[in-house]
Amino acid sequence: MENVRWGRRIRAFRRLKRLSQVELAKEMEMSVSILGQIEQGKRVPSERQLDKIASLLDIPIEELKGEIKAGE
């Protein structure tokens, strides 16, 4: 269930930034397929990947992890 939560949050923040899967995958230097698997909860992102996703989406890693609410 944790994997699905990660994926949903990543997808939601990606969409808020108006990035396609293709664009984010390219910036992440990973395939669209792997990013899709992460967003679907079928693959667990590594800490390095989470840090890079948070950086690219310009959000604190704690917000991506769901540890703080937006705007705090």
Please identify what each model-predicted range represents.
Residues R18-Q37:
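Short alpha-helical DNA-recognition segment
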